[in-house]
From Swiss-Prot:
Oligomeric form and interacting partners: The Tol-Pal system is composed of five core proteins: the inner membrane proteins TolA, TolQ and TolR, the periplasmic protein TolB and the outer membrane protein Pal. They form a network linking the inner and outer membranes and the peptidoglycan layer.
The protein's name: Tol-Pal system protein TolA
UniProt-annotated stretches for the region Disordered: 112-219
Function: Part of the Tol-Pal system, which plays a role in outer membrane invagination during cell division and is important for maintaining outer membrane integrity.
Native source organism of the sequence: Pseudomonas aeruginosa (strain ATCC 15692 / DSM 22644 / CIP 104116 / JCM 14847 / LMG 12228 / 1C / PRS 101 / PAO1)
Gene: tolA
Compositional bias per record (Basic and acidic residues), positions renumbered to this chain: 112-206
Side of membrane Periplasmic, spans: 38-347
Pfam family, any one: TonB_2
Membrane-side (Cytoplasmic) residue stretches: 1-16
Position of the signal peptide: none
Keywords (A to Z) from UniProt: Cell cycle, Cell division, Cell inner membrane, Cell membrane, Membrane, Repeat, Transmembrane, Transmembrane helix
Length: 347
């Protein structure tokens, strides 16, 4: 019986080998699970636990087998340690890379956030600048509009003032023109009235002279001899004496005519004063044409003397003298003296 339970050398190595293999499998499984699910920890020295199973075999082969298994286990544990170190370094590298990536992501996020903030700040600043620019443009437009309105108001007021001034000047000018026109019309009327009056006086004098001439012709025929004897006299006194003999009516009428005609042609000079007098000698032909006029006694004022001579010469011709008998004309009017006075004219 005792020999029946005694094992062969191969049987005595079988179970230790199986146990060693199982042990290695368990160790590798535990290492794999530990590596797969273990949290990231700082590297630490691996702890290898070895279990030594005392086999009941007392044979040298069993001892050698156990030693071989132990050596294999130790070798296996050493390789496992290297694997774990490599994996640990790999994990640490991955962790560093992950941290670096996270830091980069954080930095990128911060940069993006900063960029976004900068863009927002820039947009806000641009918006504020545009608002300020728009406000300034609005104020400038309002100021420009106000200035334009001010200038327009000034121009309008200036135009109104100029219009008022022009209206006042036009009114003043019109009033002056009206006054001047009225004065001219009044002067014209006065001159016309005076001219009409003088013309009427001349016509009356002509009629009177014509009547007197007719009477003189009749009287001259009666006193022809005596009148001819007196023709040689050239003094004023003798002229007046002869006129008295021939008839004061004849000489008076012609003298009035001469006075009226000369008065119409006389233009009073500025230097003429009342009380002044000048005597002018008039020379005529039988047809009444005035051939000469000269000063026979001066007033002492040359302009006044010249105005008297010019008035006589401007008469030109007195046709009424043709009505006188030749003898009467020669004795009284071939040379006739006239006295000019500023206030009147007398012969």
């Amino acid at each position: 019986m005792k020999q029946q339970f005694e094992r062969s050398p191969s049987e005595s190595y079988f179970w230790p080998v199986v146990l060693a293999v199982v042990l290695h499998v368990l160790i590798f499984a535990m290492l794999f699970v530990s590596w797969a699910f273990a949290p990231e920890l700082p590297p630490s020295k691996p702890i290898v636990q070895a279990t030594l199973y005392q086999l009941k075999s007392k044979s040298q082969a069993t001892t050698q087998t156990n030693q071989k298994i132990a050596g294999e286990a130790k070798k296996t544990a050493s390789k496992q340690y290297e694997v774990e170190q490599l994996e640990q370094k790999k994990l640490e590298q991955q962790k560093l890379e992950q941290q670096k990536l996270e830091q980069q992501q954080v930095a990128a996020a911060k940069a993006a956030e900063q960029k976004k903030a900068d863009e927002a700040r820039k947009a806000e600043a641009q918006k504020a600048a545009e608002a300020k620019k728009a406000d300034e443009a609005k104020k400038a437009a309002e100021a420009k509009a106000a200035e334009q309105k001010k200038q327009a108001d000034i121009a309008k007021k200036r135009a109104e003032d100029e219009a008022k001034k022009k209206a006042a000047e036009d009114a003043k000018k019109k009033a002056a023109e009206d006054a001047k026109k009225k004065a001219a019309e009044e002067a014209k009327k006065k001159a016309a009235a005076e001219a009409a009056k003088k013309k009427a006086a001349v016509e009356a004098a002509k009629k009177k002279a014509a009547a007197a001439a007719a009477a003189a012709r009749k009287a001259a025929e009666d006193k022809k001899a005596r009148a001819l004897a007196e023709l040689l006299s050239d003094t004023t006194e003798r002229q007046q004496a002869l006129a008295d003999e021939v008839g004061s009516e004849v000489t008076g009428s012609l003298d009035d005519l001469i006075v009226n005609l000369v008065s119409q042609q006389w233009r009073r000079p500025p230097s003429a004063r009342n009380g002044m007098s000048v005597e002018v000698l008039i020379e005529m032909l039988p047809d009444g044409t005035i051939t000469n006029a000269s000063v026979s006694r001066s007033s002492g004022d040359k302009p006044f003397d010249s105005s008297a001579v010019a008035a006589v010469r401007n008469v030109g011709r007195i046709p009424e003298m043709q009505q006188l008998p030749r003898a009467t004309f020669d004795s009284l009017y071939r040379q006739r003296r006239i006295i000019f006075k500023p206030e009147d004219l007398s012969l």
